[in-house]
């Protein structure tokens, strides 16, 4: 009986969870809610009445758009009442309705293709960025204008983002409307400014490319020789092992000083090019220019398993090589920066979340770029505008209602367009490696030699070994050893 009760409870819980998933709430974007005066619960084609729960989720926004004693209908004979009624939602009827699209658009910011700035020194890259009218000056100027900053333009043009002066200020740049020649309008001499500063650059490991490769091929350094000797009356299978520390030496030179400001976000392996064996790891969170080269070492072993006839020896030979490679390289680097807008906000409409009407002078900084402000709120969280209190600082619902969703999507997409420059230079590496162990034809030992060795406890041994450890170390082969053991 108890098992049946437990089973029934589990089934009820599972069905409840499934129902909760089916009925999960969807975001309601206030800027897409429209007022319709077509009668109780009547909306235009493509729209439906807003439900009570949906109205509750954006109640503050709806009430702020209503008259003091206004009453507007919702679905299923619910109404929401204006500020004079403290925004009460209750059962009732009204001759007008809050309506919502059947297919709402969330309004995600589009991701535009990267803007690639040619390689150069840091000041060259910055200059190209802040002086580009179409890709930078106009988008950021229009953003400031849409947010409510006054006079984002110069005296010689009636349009936003035109006739703008760009000047170097400290480690950044100031973009501001030209104030020469006089102007007309309230406080028109107080132009809003846009400062671009605190640049940083982050390497993109996956963006690696290279030019023509010059590779030496393998060059013989030394040949190690020995004999694998069997002193017994029976054939012996042996293991001949060459063991050594393999070194790889590498270096790079950088074409432009921008590399001094570029950092790597995560450690990564230098890409393999050609046939030169490399195992190079670039450390994280360091200046790219500071990593000029280095050496890596790994222990390598090569073995062979020949069978040596009785009272015979097999010639053993292994060749040691080195090779080098060089080529020009290029990585892309993401550009990150601070964008600071400063000026007074328009009385006739601004997007600050309190919508002040006393024309306050306001300064606000956005952290732009894929590696700026990681872990913090997105600097332009338009897609979270349906959550009251989540969208800090700016009222994106207001900007969308004022200028249109597509206009704001287009502008914010251009402001957030990824900006990249290039880090270029030349790469060189040298690596050492061993070939396979070669085994020659057996050689029968003389009777005299066998008699001299008969008293030895060793059954197999390496004889006539030609291996100069010191000379090999100078060539990059460390701790070289050649050993032989019988197979057990």
UniProtKB/Swiss-Prot annotation:
Where does this protein chiefly localize? secreted
**Region (Part of the transmembrane beta-barrel after proteolytic activation of the toxin and insertion into the host membrane) location:** 256-288
Q: Which InterPro entries match?
A: Aerolysin-like_C, Aerolysin/haemolysin_CS, Aerolysn, APT_dom, APT_N_sf, CTDL_fold
Coiled-coil stretches, from where to where?
none
Q: Name one GO molecular function term.
A: toxin activity
> Could you tell me which Pfam families the record lists for this protein?
Aerolysin, APT
Q: What does this protein do?
A: Secreted, cytolytic toxin that forms pores in host membranes after proteolytic removal of a C-terminal propeptide, leading to destruction of the membrane permeability barrier and cell death. The pores are formed by transmembrane beta-strands and are approximately 3 nm in diameter.
User: What's the domain remark here?
Assistant: The C-terminal propeptide is required for normal protein folding and secretion; it maintains the aerolysin precursor in its soluble form and prevents premature heptamerization and pore formation.
Q: What is this protein called?
A: Aerolysin
User: To which species is this protein native?
Assistant: Aeromonas sobria
């Amino acid at each position: 009986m108890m098992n049946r009760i437990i089973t029934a409870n589990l089934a009820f819980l599972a069905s409840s969870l499934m129902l909760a998933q089916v009925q999960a709430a969807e975001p309601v974007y206030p800027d897409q809610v429209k007022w319709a005066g077509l009668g109780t619960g009547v909306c235009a084609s493509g729209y439906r009445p807003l439900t009570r729960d949906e109205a509750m989720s954006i109640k503050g926004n709806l009430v702020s758009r209503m008259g003091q004693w206004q009453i507007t209908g919702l679905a299923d004979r619910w109404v929401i009442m204006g500020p004079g009624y403290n925004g009460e939602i209750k059962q009732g009827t009204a001759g007008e309705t809050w309506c919502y699209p059947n297919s709402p658009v969330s309004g995600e910011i589009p991701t535009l293709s990267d803007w690639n700035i040619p390689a150069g020194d840091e000041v060259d890259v910055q200059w190209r960025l802040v002086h580009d009218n179409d890709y930078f000056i106009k988008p950021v100027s229009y953003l400031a204008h849409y947010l409510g900053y006054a006079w984002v333009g110069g005296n010689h043009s009636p349009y936003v983002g035109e006739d703008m002066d760009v000047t170097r200020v400290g480690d950044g740049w100031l973009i501001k409307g030209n104030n020469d020649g006089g102007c007309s309008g309230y406080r028109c001499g107080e132009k809003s400014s846009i400062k671009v500063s605190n640049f940083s650059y982050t390497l993109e490991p996956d963006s690696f490319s290279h030019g023509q490769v010059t590779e030496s091929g393998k060059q013989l350094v030394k040949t190690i020789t020995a004999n694998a000797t069997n002193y017994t009356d029976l054939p012996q299978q042996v293991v001949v092992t060459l063991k050594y520390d393999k070194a790889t030496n590498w270096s790079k030179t950088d074409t432009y000083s921008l590399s001094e400001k570029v950092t790597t976000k995560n450690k990564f392996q230098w890409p393999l090019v050609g046939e030169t064996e490399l195992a190079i790891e670039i450390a994280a969170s360091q200046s790219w220019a500071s990593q000029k080269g280095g050496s890596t070492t790994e222990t390598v072993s090569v073995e062979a398993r020949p069978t040596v006839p009785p009272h015979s020896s097999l010639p053993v030979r292994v060749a040691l090589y080195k090779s080098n490679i060089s080529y020009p390289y290029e990585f892309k680097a993401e550009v990150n920066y601070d964008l600071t807008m400063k000026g007074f906000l328009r009385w006739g409409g601004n997007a600050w979340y309190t919508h002040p009407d006393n024309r306050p002078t306001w300064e606000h900084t956005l952290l732009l770029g894929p590696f700026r402000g990681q872990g913090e709120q997105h600097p332009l969280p338009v897609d979270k505008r349906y959550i009251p209190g989540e969208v800090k600082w700016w009222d994106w619902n207001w900007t969308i209602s004022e200028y249109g969703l597509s206009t704001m999507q287009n502008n914010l997409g251009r402001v957030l367009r990824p900006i990249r420059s290039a880090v270029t230079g030349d790469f060189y590496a040298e690596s050492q490696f061993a070939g396979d162990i070669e085994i020659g034809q057996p050689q029968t030992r003389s009777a005299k030699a066998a008699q001299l060795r008969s008293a030895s406890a060793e059954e197999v041994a390496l004889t006539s070994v030609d291996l100069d450890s010191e000379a090999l170390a100078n060539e990059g082969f460390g701790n070289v050893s050649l050993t032989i053991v019988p197979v057990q």
